[in-house]
Swiss-Prot record:
Cell wall formation. Catalyzes the transfer of a GlcNAc subunit on undecaprenyl-pyrophosphoryl-MurNAc-pentapeptide (lipid intermediate I) to form undecaprenyl-pyrophosphoryl-MurNAc-(pentapeptide)GlcNAc (lipid intermediate II). The keyword Isomerase does not apply. This is UDP-N-acetylglucosamine--N-acetylmuramyl-(pentapeptide) pyrophosphoryl-undecaprenol N-acetylglucosamine transferase. The lineage of its organism: Bacteria, Pseudomonadati, Myxococcota, Myxococcia, Myxococcales. UDP-N-acetyl-alpha-D-glucosamine binds at T10, G11, G12, N124, R165, S190, I245, Q290. It comes from the Bacteria. The gene is murG. Keywords: Cell cycle, Cell division, Cell inner membrane, Cell membrane, Cell shape, Cell wall biogenesis/degradation, Glycosyltransferase, Membrane, Peptidoglycan synthesis, Transferase. It comes from Anaeromyxobacter dehalogenans (strain 2CP-1 / ATCC BAA-258).
Length: 383
């Protein structure tokens, strides 16, 4: 089976796509996956680093661009559809999965017009504009939150959760090593989160009596690392401050409480790894979807949410202290998080995709082609 994964822009779209791709290629040596994205998106660097080929098209968003910007970006759409058609004709995928983001629209619509089975994977509680539009034509809509189902026809919805990377799955399967001091993990996504970084530093004076009793790992992003490190040391803390955490599996395994944003991929990781959390939703997220995401964990008893407008150093310190000082509460939160986890999401989504392929092509392995057969000529980036 050859799968095409279309979309990206942010890690929230890209990483679930990579997790699904990892599942597909491990099933059979003849399976392969190709991605389609844009040169400006995170996928342009992350997908090749994960070992998958990627094609690039030229397309930009329409939402929030103003009338002039939207009209200008509309002019790019015919070219994006032509590029999509060329890529699809060259790679001949058996199924196309849109993961959200600008690139998914032209590719999935063109695949539908070519009678290739299509699906979308919606990571958030509020479906993005592209996925809502594509939901009218695709065969399946994979959702992670019950709230997202209302955007799609009931017969198309598979609520299976968000796929997470295989390295995180290894952490899920690995027993946690015992450690003495409570451990706090702070991060704001792959680029850090400036407001979150600042509030954590403001919280430190209110946690001064704990500085000998807790260990802190803090991913800051490049912009704030030096300032944050100085802030910790000024308050007598000796944390592990990093611009970027390469091995999130180890970071999750070694912590008792997480302070972070409420992106869908992050929440999928927290629940599979069974970690209590304090969630600070990104206020500029489209349709305020991070607040909706966070509420699902809060309502289940797995997390505490502090909206950024209410976030002060004192408030954050109080929540950190109350959770770290209550092992029984942490354990209850961890169990609640685990009940929300979907460790089999990638496997179950791949199962449905293979069934779509079987219905269309008569075999779960798709169209007849030689094993490993690639396009007859090298792909032309953004041609």
């Amino acid at each position: 089976m050859r799968m095409m994964v279309a979309g990206g822009g942010t890690g929230g779209h890209v990483f679930p796509g990579i997790a699904l791709a990892e599942e597909v290629v491990t099933r059979h040596p003849a399976n392969d996956v190709v991605f389609v994205g844009t040169a400006r998106g995170l996928e342009a660097s992350v997908v090749p680093a994960a070992g998958f080929p990627i094609e690039l098209i030229e397309v930009k968003g329409l939402k929030g661009k103003g009338i002039a910007g939207a009209l200008l970006n509309l002019l790019l759409l015919p070219r994006a559809f032509l590029q999509s058609w060329r890529i699809l004709r060259r790679w001949r995928p058996d199924v196309v999965v849109g993961v959200g983001g600008y690139a998914s629209g032209p590719v999935v619509l063109t695949a539908w017009a070519m009678r290739i089975p299509t699906a979308v994977q919606e990571q958030n509680a509020i479906a993005g504009l592209t996925n809502r539009l594509l939901g009218r034509v695709v065969k399946a809509a994979f959702t992670a939150f019950p709230e997202a189902a209302r955007h799609f026809a009931a017969r198309k919805v598979y609520q299976l959760g968000n796929p997470i990377r295989r390295r995180l799955m290894e952490n899920y399967m690995r027993p946690e090593s015992a450690h003495g001091q409570p451990r706090l993990l702070v991060f704001g996504g792959s680029q850090g989160a400036h407001a979150l970084n600042m509030r954590v530093i403001e919280a430190l004076p209110h946690l001064a009596d704990l500085r000998e009793r807790i260990q802190i790992t803090h991913q800051t992003g490049a912009r704030d690392r030096e300032y944050v490190e100085k802030g910790y040391r000024a308050c007598g803390f000796t944390p592990d401050v990093r611009e970027f955490i390469d091995d999130m599996s180890a970071a999750y395994a070694g912590c008792d409480l997480v302070v972070c944003r409420a992106g869908a991929t992050t929440l999928a990781e927290l629940t599979v790894c069974k970690k209590p959390s304090i969630l600070v939703p990104f206020p500029a997220a489209a349709d305020n979807h991070q607040v909706k995401n966070a509420r699902s964990l809060v309502d289940a008893g797995a997390a505490v949410m502090i909206e950024e407008r209410d976030l002060t150093g004192e408030v954050l310190a109080r929540e950190i202290r109350e959770i770290l000082d209550a092992p029984e509460r942490r354990e209850r939160m961890a169990r609640a998080a685990g009940r929300l986890g979907s460790p089999q999401a990638a496997k179950e989504i791949a199962d449905v995709c293979m069934e779509l392929v079987r219905r269309r092509w008569g075999s779960p392995f798709g169209q007849a082609r030689e094993p490993g057969q690639k396009p007859a000529r090298p792909p032309d980036p953004a041609s």
